[in-house]
Amino acid sequence: MSDPASTSIPAHATNGEAHAPNDHHHAQLPLSDSKPVSVNRKKQKRRQKQAARLAAERQFGNGHISADMSEQNGLSPTAPASHVSDDHDLDERANGETYYEEIHDATHDLDDHPPNLSNGQPGQQNATARKSKKKKGKKNRAGSQTMGDESSTPLSTPSVSMSQHLPPPLPSHLPHTLLKTSKDRSIWNTSTQEERENIKTFWLELGEEERRQLVKVEKDAVLKKMKEQQKHSCSCTVCGRKRTAIEEELEVLYDAYYEELEQYANNNQGSFEKGPPMVPPPRLYHPPLRSPGQHTRTQGQFHPSRGRIHELPEDDEDLEEDYDEDDEDDEPYSDDEYEDEETRAARADFFAFGNSLTVKGRRQIMLLSFIFPKPVTNLIFTLADGILTVADDLLKNDGKHFIDMMEQLAERRMQREEDTQYGIAAAHQSLHGGHNHGPLDDDDYDEEEDEDYDSQEDEDYEEDEMVSSGNWPGGDAVQADSFLQDAMTEEQRMEEGRRMFQIFAARMFEQRVLTAYREKVAEQRQQKLIEELMEEQTRNEQRNAKKAREAQKRKDKKKLQKQAKEEEKARREAEKAAEEAAAKAEQEKKLEEQRRKREEQKKKREAERKAQEAERLRKEAEKQKRLREERERQAEIERKQREQKELEKKRREEARQNELREKKTKDERERKLREAAPKTDYEGQEKRDPQAKRVSHTGPVPIPASLQHAQALPAYLQSPHYQIATPIVPKAPTPARPRQPSQQGSHTSSPRSQPASTEPSQVSISPRSMAPSQSSGASSVTSKQGHGQPPLLHHPQPSTPLSPLGALNRSHPPGFSPSNPPGLGLVARPPIGHELPSYPPHSGPLMNQLRGFPAPNGLPVLPGMNGTRPMPPGRGFPLDPGHGLAFHQQPIANAFAAQPSGLSHAHSRQPSSSFERSPLDAHAFPISRPSPIKRPSSTQQDQNNRSAQRDVDDLSAHLGSSALLDDSDVPFTSNLSQSLPGATAPGTLPGPTRASFAGTSLFADPLAAKHSGFPIGPSVGNTWSTQIPFGTSPFPSAPTWGTGPGSGWSNNAFAPGGHHRAHTSRPVTIRLLVIQACKQLNMMSPSKGASGYHDVKVVLRQVDQLRPVNEPPISLKEMLDICDTEGNSQNGGGSFSIRSDETGECVKFEPDTNSASSGHRGSIVPGEIGSPVPSSSLPAFGGIGSSTPSVLRQFSSPTGF
């Protein structure tokens, strides 16, 4: 709504116009005079100013509304409320329909009321303000809303009875408590019935003293205001009497009214259904009940609104029944019903000033219309409306209107009394007084009383002016008053005045009771509001606390969840850390285990290495020990030999001296005997001399056929040292007693292998070798004579140094042809026996005296020379012709028996013979080294010699290597040659040692050559024939270089090939065999390469294939033990690696620098550098056709082919 201050008060309706009572009805009342009147500009200006002031007051009042009222109306204390919202309350019925009580307010409807009508024309502005208002044709219905600026009566000013517009709907921001049902909100918004019941209850609850206090307060307030107003007024008797009359009238009215109220309350308590009777018994009016809209007003605010008009039925039923507005309300008023309409409007306006005052029935309402004429009735109601207007403004204007009204009434009463007493009728005195007091002029209110009066007062006086000026006959108030007085009797006028006082008193009392009730309701509502606020605050606090608790719970829950998550995370991290720690520990454990295993392996390897080193050192120590022992033994042997030589030398010196003495004595005795002895004795002596010479010089003994080659030693196999010169003294032979040979075993390295001759024997002084008689002839075996063949005699070596010309001075044994002259290298033709089988073969000289140029008819060439092999022993048929032979080789028939390959156990010493045996029996004994020719020794001397030899035998049994043996140990014998220097294999061809001077050939014999048992070759015959300079292949089918036998020159231009001694021991031999077996397996298995491993069993089989037939079988353990030895230049070099796997043990040979030199010693394997192509006629160094490994050159089979 727009601000009331900004708009002017609308003009009043002219005659024939009526304001619309509400939004639904536009009642038009017929006007008695439609003539326009002039506008009083002064009053209009005053009305405008009053409207502006009223608007400002309303706005100021609306800004100071108490908290409970503002809460009830939905307005804030500071918000300026419109007059519409200040004039009504809300009431929500059960069905939710908003109920608005009709409220009559003194405010003006500024912009929402329907436009005024002028002469039936809508929208026409009324330009006159002094024209008399007509009554409106229709009163407000029950439930209709009228604006505050429209009057409910035609005689009331528009400011008094303003129609009220329909308020807007409830806003959505109102408190929730305002939207509750009426039952729950009874303390805030109550219906009319509930309000009446509450007021009645409040009045009944008051005590008598409180009720009198209320009435007294009203009376005192009115009197006090009146005294204050009359303080500066006239103090004449008339005015004094008037004041007294007013006081008395008020006291009477209030007392009587209170009595009537008390009587009515006592008599009619509980006798009504919808509410208490609002009017006491006839003539008595009690304070009417206010509508709910009036309960929101406080003292000093707006006018109390007027609710519905209720009427009491004739049968005294409840006065709360709403006035029936259906009869003649909806129809517009017509001219025919003017009177009725005017009467009805007057009645409605009359009862409107009492604000819900009711009368005893319609008849009483219509009574005034019948009693008074129409103009008088209008005037009365005009005055009544003015009185009510003053009553409504009492609290706002400090009761000034009421006081003025009372003064007027008092003046009228005094006038009536004077008229009664003096018979003077002056109607105009009733209004303005009659004691020289001029009537109230409108100008008195212009400036002085503007703040105390509102527009309603202006309307009142305006109405008065209108009534006096144009609405009544006579044109002024005096005429109207006279007319009224003329029309009414004095009693009626008094009764009407009293009734007016009663109405006003009831109105004032009603205001006071309602004020008290409102204060109580306000207090209750304030308390309730406080309670509700407290409850709301409590609820809010509880809600906030609940929210806080819920938030705390959520927070705690989130915290717990977070804590649980953190715990879960920590647990997972702990588990992960534990797993990592376990994995790390496991890894550490594995690493530690691996380290431990590596350490163990390292320690094991270290232990193995240490063990191997210790074993190597042990073996080395053993080897050194053996070498040391060997050297010691050799030194001991040499020492013994030197001692023996010295001893022999001494004995020889003694023997020479003895022989000289004996010779001298013998010569003397012989001379004497010759002189004295007969001639027969001389012949017998001559007969004995050749026998003694044979025994002492040559020592002819039967020799076995198999050992003839060992007994007939060539000169180049003897020691290179010069023999001790011993003069040859012819002596008579001294036969010795035959002696049983000793059955003790003799070692080749033992001193017992020396000849046991009683004469000093030839001893080699070489540190490395021994004489062939000590090696090959050391073991003598008693052989049997067979076929009656004459034995071949052993030719002893001369004691003196060999001379190149010594062969010329020597005699030849029987059956041997003499040698050629020295230096020519020519030999005589062998005897015919070589060509004829009936003669035994005879060889030429055993050795040419010229070193390096042997005689062709001397010793035969080595096997394999000139393409033929030597005749094996015992062969009785000649060789096939050809093969380079000039003629058949005559076999040596049964001349030499085959010798077994074993060692003989016969003693090597010459047994003594008795004097009784025949000299021929001596051939049955093994031949021994021939002793120098000397005089036969005596028996005693022979015994001394045997004792000395026995001492030497005992010494050899306890010294040397035999000293290391236990008494129960049996000396180990081997077919292979021992590792002693100078030792040769028994049964092989005797040859020179490496230190010998027997003319070692530059071209050694082939390793595959088979040595015969007797060194007689086919190189006999013509000495001047061509010879093969280098030798021939050992095989018969191989081509030869040169002619066959029969030539006079030797097969070898540089001397016969000497045999190398087999100096290796069995471990060295086995190691060399294993090396060669590995090499052959590498060549046979090229996929494995030269450094591959071979199974030990395969290697053992290969070694067995390479092993000589006369070598004992080699075991696997022995071979593996030999493989552990370190290699050097003697055993083939290199090293062996042995590994073990699931298939077994494997061995690999790893060569080094020593293995290369040892693999080519005197032999070249086919396929190597320097080896000849197979079946080629070109000779190679070391022999042609050598197919056996070089290891086989160290030893040879002692047998034949």
From Swiss-Prot:
- Pfam families listed in its UniProt record: NST1
Coiled coil where? 520-673
What is the superkingdom listed in this entry's lineage? Eukaryota
Give me the stretches of Low complexity compositional bias.
769-805, 926-938
Composition bias, kind Basic and acidic residues: at what positions?
Answer: 84-114, 535-553, 563-692
Subcellular localization, as worded in the UniProt entry: Cytoplasm
Q: Please list where the region (Disordered) is annotated.
A: 1-178, 268-341, 429-478, 535-707, 724-848, 899-952, 1150-1169
**Where along the chain is composition biased (Acidic residues)?**
313-341, 441-466
The annotated regions of Polar residues compositional bias extend over 116-128, 145-164, 293-302, 740-767
Q: Which UniProt keywords apply?
A: Coiled coil, Cytoplasm, Stress response
Q: Which InterPro entries match?
A: Fungal_stress_NST1, NST1
Q: Does the keyword Cytoplasm apply?
A: yes
Q: Which family does it belong to?
A: Belongs to the NST1 family.
Described function: May act as a negative regulator of salt tolerance.
Q: What name is this protein filed under?
A: Stress response protein nst1
